[in-house]
Each structure stands twice: as structure tokens, then as C-alpha cells.
């Protein structure tokens, strides 16, 4: 009978409470909250590390790049290997002075219209460069002499005839270049003539007079060059450059070494500087001539009257 007794209905709010608030055990371990907080801190730290290590996908500075594949060539591709001639700049680098000179001479011979352009483009030869070329010819002449025997004999002359002709030809070609009106500076012309005359002094002397004709002709040509330059230099400042350059003494020494072959140039120099040397030469040994020469030297040097006392008071 008791089993048939109906149980009283449970109020609805009991079901609602049981759904919203599930039952929990009454007794929980004391260490559970601490463990949960520790795990939560570790999870937050790991989450922060993962966010910092990850690259932002929306960053404007990030540009995705693809790594080069193994088939892509990193270095510049070279053309197909094969024989080919050198370019003009590389070819010119391999040529020495003699070879380059020969190439230019050959081109100018085949194309005469290029000769003037080469002359205008090339730098003007200096006295030093011209003398270096002449000394090279002189060295070739000296090395052509036979060993032993008489260096003034006809045999020696025949052995050195070709290099001797090359030197004399170079002298006749270079000298007009340093003469007026092509050379406008008398100092450059005089400097060239001074060195070239010394080279002529060193030309070999031969026992046969006919072999010395070329040497005598060289003296005649250089004497004419001296006269031309002296007259041109005398027009510049009354010839003061000739006086203070000591060219009268240098030319007199050259004339002595040549055996008087330059006497005409010495006379022309004395005539050009006659207003300086005339009274001294005419009154040589007389007190008057020496006094006039001394006064002229003081005037030219700017020392005239420095030792004279200045008069003070009424004249």
C-alpha cells in the first residue's frame, strides 16, 4: 500500500535551481586554487611568447620573399666561350713605344689626311724630350764602334756610318722646331742650341778629311741657328736677356771647342750687344771705358747711386 502512495510533486523552481547551479562537492582540497592560478600564469606566458615570435600578417613593412630555387643562376651568365680579337683599348695597352710609333706611322702613310690631325693632337715636344731622342741616337752611335783598332780610321767610319747619319738627320729635323718663328720664346731656343751644340762637339773626328764633311756641315747649320736666335732675342728688351743669361760666355766657349766654326755667331752676338760692350771693348785698358762699363752695370742692376751721400741744405 505504501508503494502506491504518490509522491508529492517537486516544485518547478527546484528544477531550475538544479539546472543553473550544478551540485559541487562539499569538500575540496586546499591546494586546488593555487594550482589553477599557476597553470593560468604559465598559459598566459606561453601565449605571450607565441604572439611575440609570430610575424604579424597585416604589417605593411613585411614583404614576403621566395628563396631562390636550386635551378636559378646567381652569377651573371657569360657568353659562349670562343676565340675573338682584342678590343682597341686592350690592344693599345699591349703595345710598347716603338710598336705604337710604327702603327701610327703606318696609318699616316696609308691615310695622309690623318697626319695633320696627329700633329695637332700630339703634345708639343719639349727641349728635354727632344734631347732624350738625340742622346739615344748618340748612344747607338757610340755602341756601333768596333772593339779595338783606330777609332778614327776609315774602317771605323764605315762601321758607324749608318748610326752617324741617323744622328745628324735627327739634328737637322729637331733644330728648326726650336727656332723662331715656330718657337716664340728665345730662352727655349737658346737652351736647346746650347745642349745640341754640345752634342755636336762629341761627334767623332776622322783621320780622313772627307769623312769630316758631315761634322763640319753640322757646325755650319748650328751656327746659322745661333745667329737667328740671337737676332730675335736682341729684339726683346734690348738684348738684356742675352747679357744676363751669360750667353756671350757660353757661345765663346762653344766657339773655342769647335775650333772657330761658330765665330760668325760670336760676332753677331757682339754686334747685337754693342751698346753694352762697345765702349768697354773700344776703351779696353783705359780708365774711362771701365768707368762707363761700371756705370752701365750699376744702372742695369739697380744699384747706381746707393753709395753716394745725399746732400742736405740749399743747393
From Swiss-Prot:
Subcellular location(s) per record: Cytoplasm; Nucleus
Domain of life of the organism encoding this protein: Eukaryota
GO cellular component terms listed in the entry, alphabetical order: cytoplasm; nucleus
The entry's keywords: Cytoplasm, Nucleus, Protein transport, Transport
GO MF terms held by the record: proteasome binding
Listed Gene3D superfamilies: Tethering factor for nuclear proteasome Cut8/Sts1
Chief place where the protein resides: cytoplasm
Residue ranges with Basic and acidic residues bias: 40-50
InterPro entries on file: Cut8/Sts1_fam, Cut8/Sts1_sf
Family: Belongs to the cut8/STS1 family.
Role summary: Involved in ubiquitin-mediated protein degradation. Regulatory factor in the ubiquitin/proteasome pathway that controls the turnover of proteasome substrates. Targets proteasomes to the nucleus and facilitates the degradation of nuclear proteins.
Subunit structure: Binds the proteasome.
Name under which the protein is recorded: Tethering factor for nuclear proteasome sts1
Native source species: Emericella nidulans (strain FGSC A4 / ATCC 38163 / CBS 112.46 / NRRL 194 / M139) (Aspergillus nidulans)
Record lineage: Eukaryota, Fungi, Dikarya, Ascomycota, Pezizomycotina
Name of the encoding gene: sts1
Amino acid at each position: 500500500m505504501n508503494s502506491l502512495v504518490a509522491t508529492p510533486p517537486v516544485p518547478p523552481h527546484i528544477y531550475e535551481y538544479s539546472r543553473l547551479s550544478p551540485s559541487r562537492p562539499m569538500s575540496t582540497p586546499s591546494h586546488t586554487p593555487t594550482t589553477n592560478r599557476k597553470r593560468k600564469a604559465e598559459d598566459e606566458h606561453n601565449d605571450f611568447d607565441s604572439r611575440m615570435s609570430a610575424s604579424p600578417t597585416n604589417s605593411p613593412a613585411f614583404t614576403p620573399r621566395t628563396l631562390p630555387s636550386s635551378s636559378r643562376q646567381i652569377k651573371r651568365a657569360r657568353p659562349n666561350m670562343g676565340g675573338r680579337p682584342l678590343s682597341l683599348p686592350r690592344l693599345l695597352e699591349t703595345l710598347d713605344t716603338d710598336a705604337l710609333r710604327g702603327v701610327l706611322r703606318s696609318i699616316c702613310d696609308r691615310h695622309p689626311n690623318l697626319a695633320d690631325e696627329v700633329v695637332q693632337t700630339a703634345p708639343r715636344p719639349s727641349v728635354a724630350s727632344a734631347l732624350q731622342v738625340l742622346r739615344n741616337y748618340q748612344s747607338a752611335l757610340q755602341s756601333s764602334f768596333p772593339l779595338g783598332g783606330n777609332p778614327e780610321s776609315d774602317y771605323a767610319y764605315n762601321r758607324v756610318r749608318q748610326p752617324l747619319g741617323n744622328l745628324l738627320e735627327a739634328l737637322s729635323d729637331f733644330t728648326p722646331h726650336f727656332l723662331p718663328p715656330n718657337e716664340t720664346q728665345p730662352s727655349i731656343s737658346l737652351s736647346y742650341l746650347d745642349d745640341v751644340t754640345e752634342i755636336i762637339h762629341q761627334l767623332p773626328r776622322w783621320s780622313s778629311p772627307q769623312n769630316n764633311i758631315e761634322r763640319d756641315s753640322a757646325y755650319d747649320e748650328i751656327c746659322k741657328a745661333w745667329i737667328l736666335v740671337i737676332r730675335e732675342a736682341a729684339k726683346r728688351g734690348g738684348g738684356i736677356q742675352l747679357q744676363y743669361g751669360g750667353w756671350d760666355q757660353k757661345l765663346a766657349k762653344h766657339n773655342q771647342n769647335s775650333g772657330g766654326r761658330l765665330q760668325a755667331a760670336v760676332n753677331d752676338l757682339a754686334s747685337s750687344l754693342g751698346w753694352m760692350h762697345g765702349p768697354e771693348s773700344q776703351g779696353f785698358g783705359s780708365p774711362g771705358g771701365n768707368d762707363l762699363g761700371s756705370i752701365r752695370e750699376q744702372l742695369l742692376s739697380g744699384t747706381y747711386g746707393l753709395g753716394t751721400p745725399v746732400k742736405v741744405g740749399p743747393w
